[in-house]
Amino acid sequence: MLSIFDIYKIGVGPSSSHTNGPMIAGYRFVQQLLPQLNKVARIQVDLYGSLSLTGKGHHTDRATLLGLMGNQPATIKIGDANQTLREALQTGKLRLNGQHDIAFDYHQDLLFHQDNLPLHENGMTLSAFDTQGQQIDFETYYSVGGGFVATAEQLQNGTATADVTVTYPFTSADEMLHQAEKHGLSLGGMILRNELAFQEMAVIDAKADQIWRVMSQCMERGFATEGILEGGLNVTRRAPSLLKKLEANAAIENDPMEVMDWINLFAFAVSEENAAGGQVVTSPTNGAAGVIPAVLMYYHRFIKALDTKQLKDFLAVSGAIGILYKTNASISGAEVGCQGEVGVSSSMAAAGLTALRGGSNEQICMAAEIAMEHSLGMTCDPIGGLVQVPCIERNAMGAVKAINASRMALKRTSKCLISLDKVIETMYQTGKDMNKKYRETSLGGLALIHLAPLCE
């Protein structure tokens, strides 16, 4: 069983699968090399499939090298690390794990391949060689979405994640509802009891507060930072100007729909920070990192100030929904399109908000189902391989959809026709049926309608 904090992780933008995952892979590989690190004279990085096709726009190349240098997504000081990396590329010397220098030629030692490796669309192989050109070690990694990374052996053996026994196990939404009903528990209460198999409640409290703090700080940076996002599209950050407009109009307008502008603002701020490579919370991916903070801030600002108890309830319920998608379908845009990113995040947010609004366990799952039902078929076709267009606006749309799905579920008096389990199954099958052009390759859709300059 996964922890909700496997779904909610602190990292850096712009992508959990294409930035955080490769950084983790690079870090793991260099740790694997430590016993013979002094023998390493050369490292070769081979990127495949979506990691190659959108790798430059998603900073996959940079992230992999930063991982090899000893950095991890949760703790990296991205400004300092990027400066160190720039110096390394200029001098042609890469310092492995911060302690062993090797020669590195970006154009010879980091290779992009359009074909896929056999087990997943996001594959990469890292190889180490000695001074004689003999291979010392190699490993193939798959970045399977949401910052989850597995070796080929782990994927083949089904051991990519630790198998932790919890008090109330479930593998489907129906089983989750049955367990809660059988033991007379709310979904939030049941999931938090399961979390005790991973850590004490004091640690859960601290992690929940940290998640909200990072989300809020990210949003504040987004409010304050003006300018053009890098990458060549000349996309202007919109959050600062929208905030000024909303604050200026607060006293003179009486627009009942203005709350939607605030929700858009919250999502824009986080998504623009993510696009700029800032620190975000993967929820469940970086490409969808603006949805859940926007819904939480909507509740905090317009309904009721969040306390730790409410925050834990939201994260528990929404995290459980994310776990269902992760284990029974996919949260990888390269595997199932954006329905697996913004679609899943919207579904998670709808469930969490419904819990905060006092919805029943059944209404929570109904809200999650509604949000996904109306995300089915959503493509992942980022222009220029950048997490900018359509990604930033799509996060805002996902947040608004989540709130509407929650309201629909709370007001409904009849039973729904489609269960959450069925819509998860449908999402996965739809993604597998989707042409690869629309699964994070930038080979179709909007990515071809508007051709962007190649990212350097």
Spans of features found by a protein language model:
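Secondary-structure capping and boundary motifs in well-ordered enzyme cores
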Residues: 259, 284, 288, 310, ...
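Extended hydrophobic packing segments that form well-structured cores
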Residues: 417-456
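Conserved phosphate/anionic-ligand binding catalytic regions in large, soluble enzymes, centered on
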Residues: 8-26, 276-295, 338-346
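Accessory "access/gating" subregions that flank catalytic or transport cores
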Residues: 201-333, 337, 445-456
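C-terminal domain-closing interface element
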Residues: 65-85, 113, 343, 348-355, ...
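Alpha-helical support elements that line or immediately flank enzyme active sites
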Residues: 17-34, 293-305, 350-358
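Hydrophobic alpha-helical bundle architecture
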Residues: 306, 317, 323-396, 408-417
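C-terminal regulatory domains involved in ligand/effector binding and gene-expression control
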Residues: 73-252
